């Protein structure tokens, strides 16, 4: 059974617990196997890089590290509030498509 994560790349999320509680950012990467996400501006770490063809000098770089997906909540684009996600089926021609919807205002997210 595949590991599912409730957010997708490009979603705006808010961190709901931990050191970065209340911070808002965009999802840069989703790691479904680890159940983690990388959020822009959250969990910044310094990484020591050895000299290589890309960086002949080497050095210390700062980048975002993954956090647990359960620690973030999707921000609804319409109401602008952190919300849980529900699913709906919408009719497209003869086929039904499953879409995400805001639990607070009912707006379809994607």
Curated annotation (Swiss-Prot):
InterPro entries in the record: KOW, Rib_uL2_dom2, Ribosomal_uL24, Ribosomal_uL24_CS, Ribosomal_uL24_KOW, Translation_prot_SH3-like_sf
Alphabetical UniProt keywords: Ribonucleoprotein, Ribosomal protein, RNA-binding, rRNA-binding
Gene Ontology biological process: translation
Record CDD domains: KOW_RPL26
Domain of life: Bacteria
Gene3D superfamilies in UniProt: 2.30.30.30
Pfam families: KOW (PF00467), ribosomal_L24 (PF17136)
Quaternary structure, from the entry: Part of the 50S ribosomal subunit.
Described function: One of two assembly initiator proteins, it binds directly to the 5'-end of the 23S rRNA, where it nucleates assembly of the 50S subunit. One of the proteins that surrounds the polypeptide exit tunnel on the outside of the subunit.
Record family assignment: Belongs to the universal ribosomal protein uL24 family.
Name assigned to this protein: Large ribosomal subunit protein uL24
Chain's gene name: rplX
